[in-house]
Amino acid sequence: MTKQRLLFITTGGTIASVRTQQGLKPVLTSEELLAHLPELKELCCPETLALCSIDSTDLGQEHWLMMARAIQENYALYDGFIICHGTDTLAYSAAALSYLIQNADKPIILTGAQQPISNEITDAKKNLRDSVVCAIDPGSRGVMVVFGGHVIAGTRAKKNKTISYDAFASVNFPELALVQGDRLVRYISSPWPTGPVEFSRVLDPKVFLLKLTPGMSPALIPEIFRLYDCVIVESFGVGGIPQQLMDAFAAGLGDYCLLYTSPSPRDS
């Protein structure tokens, strides 16, 4: 059987870091990263593309567009894509790519690690291997997060642990699959695309997430409306908003885009 061609896109993060006097620094090249796992060549034909080498806390919308563009430019050349990413903003990137890349009929996987791949004890090697196992499965397609053996839809991943290897959970949706050794145990089939793959090259950077807290000053609202095109309000419970804030929203709303969501990770 012909091995699938997978493109590993590296962005930095803990997985590609080494310890320095200033702390962890993402300095490993994409080739150096994969050199720690030569056995991957038994499962696939891996190739690499270094997109950037930064801490994921510095990664934002311009990098999401870079990732989407890199996948678009190489889409016809590879059977799947694995993005090596820092864990702090990995879920944001997965969600963004889920909307930037529509109707993907190939797997686009984001993974990372809680410990650098150069460490004697690390989860990086398992996460990379698990990502390959998922990517070469014929039923895998679309944007996913593979971490700690769990396969999570790109729009549902949330980092809920800062140290444990089991760092990500699926919010309000079942996990797609579980990786057990070299076997993928699928719980939910990935939907078939409804049309040809589509790539977007436009993002509105002026979207703000406003988390309500007791006693928040309504004086903040006009300034937020001035700076942003859309505000997502993380309200209390199932939509509770203090009356003072509600009045401030109503006063400046007009044609403004205002969305409400719940802070509850379950049943929302």
Question: Language-model features: where?
Answer:
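Short acidic, glycine-rich surface-loop motifs adjacent to enzyme active sites
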Residues: 78-90, 227-237
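Accessory alpha-helical/coil subdomains and C-terminal extensions
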Residues: 9-10, 36-37, 153-238
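Short beta-strand segments
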Residues: 9-11, 83-85, 109-112, 144-148, ...
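ATP/NTP phosphate-donor binding region
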Residues: 1-73, 247
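Internal gly/pro-rich beta-alpha loop/helix module
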Residues: 110-179
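A short helix->loop->beta-strand "cap" motif at the edges of active sites that frequently abuts
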Residues: 105-106, 254-258
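Short Gly/Thr/Asp-enriched flexible loops that form oxyanion-binding sites at enzyme active sites
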Residues: 84-106, 241-249
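Conserved small/polar residues in nucleotide/adenosyl-binding loops
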Residues: 260-267
